[in-house]
């Protein structure tokens, strides 16, 4: 393989739902490594804290990355996985960081969807906006122009906070769940 795509899925995804794009990765000769968070897919356990979630992602990365020493590694986050991808990319500096439908923070995303829920009840704030300025790798942001779950304005806000080379691509007529079509 030429390199690795380290994939962090969204809330509705798991290892099984993302294997549909495998042909693309085969064609470009990149291996795909998908992390299933605790309690997702066939992974057991329960997410107890944001710190635990970040630690799990880092442990998975540390287990696979040495096999690709000297080869490009792309960290790819989708929706929920974007905040986790930003934190990891900030710490390990991959060749490229790809964020699809990213949020500025989970608290902000949650309050937009459920404005009646007190902010302190949001268990995992995952402040992407507070971390992305520390990323030194190039960043590609992809967002559906008709995303009603996480608005494209979140990608625009994140783009403005990135200090590394950054590109934002808005996908016309795509929403949150169909951006990969």
Task: Describe the residue ranges of each PLM region.
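Alpha/beta-hydrolase-fold catalytic nucleophile elbow
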Residues: 36, 98-101, 171
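Catalytic histidine-centered segment of alpha/beta-hydrolase-like enzymes
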Residues: 174-181
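Short beta-strand/loop motif that positions the catalytic acidic residue
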Residues: 134-136, 141-143, 147
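Short alpha-helix in the alpha/beta-hydrolase fold that links the catalytic acid
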Residues: 21, 128, 137, 151-160
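Primarily recognizes the serine-hydrolase "nucleophile elbow" in alpha/beta-hydrolase
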Residues: 63-114
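Membrane-embedded segments
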Residues: 1-63, 67, 71, 89
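Short, flexible loop segments at the rims of nucleotide/cofactor-binding pockets, characterized by
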Residues: 9-11, 74, 116-122
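Active-site nucleophile elbow and catalytic-triad environment of alpha/beta-hydrolase enzymes
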Residues: 117-131, 136-137
